[in-house]
């Protein structure tokens, strides 16, 4: 009730503020002038409670009364109710001011209604009191059961968790008013889940009551009930289910299924071969069930175990090849342990599970065995045929010791005999092939299926059998104005023999060129040399080319020397002294032409091309004069209409060959109906084509057909035929229907179109005269 009075006071402040302002203004005015008005008594609204319970089933429920203190009960005032819900949810008695609720209300949908009230004097129609707001509050009743809004609930908790471990918290919600008594105060209880779980009554927190083992049961269903009104009689309740799953912890160690495993292995099996599998089981799941298999150190020389992490099996593999003749059985001990073991769970894994594995070696017929995995031999090049290279050896590892035969796979350079001795079958050249990669095959004599192969590498050693030579072809030029001591070329040499660090070349001029005073050579002692001029000035006309013989020797044993010729061209370098243009001049001079001759040849070529272009241009201009207009294509038959088509007859062209034939046979046929739109077009004729007799005969035949055709349409049409023509200067004739009347049209201009239109001019001229 106190809250309601406070709310009324706060809502009434805005309504009283104008009155307070008016009072203040009145007091201010009293200071300035004497009071003239009578003392007024303050009036206002009078009402009692404004509460209505929700879910009232009566059709009309009285809420309270609005009344003005000016109302003396003579029914002279009219009360009106305004705002949301007025007239639909709430009504007011216009005479008494009583307010009624005409609908069932639900506080959870709307708990407050703010309305406005007016009181009007019926006689004057004016408001007696200022419009006022008031609040109707819907009272709450316990009509909503608690609901769990976050369903479904699911929680995961580790197995073997201690008592009191928090699992999950469930929360229910009640739509009733929490400030109205105990309607929304909830109490939680456990309907299903004992004795492993418990729930706190006020918070809904679920906790573990006793330890649980996932291997016995991995999930539990717990049912929680929530009651409002703190569980008092008449309270409403709601329930929810919680699925609680136990997560696995590594509280179980792996154990072998068998205490003894028997496996076999062939002595021919290569290393890495899988011999068999062993298996242990673990009640845990996930990474807690991942295992690591191993072999005790004393037995791990020949065999090993790897773990297949997908199947959790131990795969026994061959670590080292076995020999039946040396040892035909083995015994090893394997153990298994978990891969992930937390420190707090080490008490469950103090001792690893073990098993014993017996492995039997199976005897097989083995191929020959070489003493070495590969052989490397060396031989000098240019050795004679049949020279010794080396010896390979293989034996039969079996007890019967079968004889061995040797062979070299795809080799035409080397031979091998039954003793494994390798010799050359051809001469060797290191510059052709420095290494030979071969394959030696050993085969048992009594069992040719037993074959072994190993690689054989033969290196051909170098001897000094190639003389040095120029590393490239040199184009050397010297200017006519070159001075003495000028470097004109740097040369280097190569040797096809094997390159060594101390490989060195020596450069000298030949005995014949030593006395030559034009050029000299200086050895740079780094396998290069420079060519220098030995005089000042050269003459291109007298001595255009010099040939110098250069001796290049190596430091091999024995030393080899070669003679190489360097060609030096004399070049007119001009004032710049540069030899960049010497190559072009050399090409010109090699053709035997001087510069003046080449210029003359170029001028002649330009004149010839100019004459050709001029001739082509004149021919093109003549063609343009013969055919000045190209507005249309040349055709054998040309039909042109200015109307929108004349039907199928537009596509029927005549054959010009028929016009030129001596005998013309034509059949009369009915003309198809065409549109009445007529256009005509005259064309220019270049006075070329068949003679007029042919056209005259053709036109007369067409005229005869038109005059005798009973199905001809009632309009004229003009068809123009041209022979290789390009148009007419006369222009287009107007359609006969384009004129408004014959009286408005003058056809005198037809007389100006020439003799070709004379007949047409006579026809229209006579028609005009007859009309006149």
UniProtKB/Swiss-Prot annotation:
List all topological domains (Extracellular). 44-596
TM regions (residue ranges): 597-617
On whether Transport is a keyword of this UniProt record, the answer is: no
For the Cytoplasmic compartment, the record's topological domain ranges are 618-772
The record ties this protein, via CDD domains, to:
Cadherin_repeat (cd11304)
GO molecular function terms attached to this record:
beta-catenin binding; cadherin binding; calcium ion binding
One example of a Gene Ontology biological process annotation: cell-cell adhesion mediated by cadherin
Propeptide residue numbers? Answer: 22-43
Q: Does the keyword Signal apply?
A: yes
Which tissue types show expression of this protein? Expressed in many tissues, with the exception of uterus.
Q: Give the keywords, sorted.
A: Calcium, Cell adhesion, Cell membrane, Cleavage on pair of basic residues, Glycoprotein, Membrane, Metal-binding, Repeat, Signal, Transmembrane, Transmembrane helix
Q: Name the membrane topology term.
A: Single-pass type I membrane protein
Q: Where in or outside the cell?
A: Cell membrane
The residues covered by the Cadherin domain are 44-148, 149-256, 257-370, 371-470, 470-581
- Principal localization reads membrane
Signal peptide residue numbers: 1-21
Cited InterPro entries = Cadherin (IPR039808), Cadherin-like_dom (IPR002126), Cadherin-like_sf (IPR015919), Cadherin_CS (IPR020894), Cadherin_Y-type_LIR (IPR000233), Catenin-bd_sf (IPR027397)
User: According to its record, what are the GO cellular component terms?
Assistant: adherens junction; catenin complex; plasma membrane
Task: Give the sugar-modified residues.
Answer: 57, 74, 419, 437, 508, 515-516, 534
Outline what the protein does.
Answer: Cadherins are calcium-dependent cell adhesion proteins. They preferentially interact with themselves in a homophilic manner in connecting cells; cadherins may thus contribute to the sorting of heterogeneous cell types.
Q: Domain annotation text? A: Three calcium ions are usually bound at the interface of each cadherin domain and rigidify the connections, imparting a strong curvature to the full-length ectodomain.
Q: What is this protein called?
A: Cadherin-19
Q: What is the lineage of its organism?
A: Eukaryota, Metazoa, Chordata, Craniata, Vertebrata
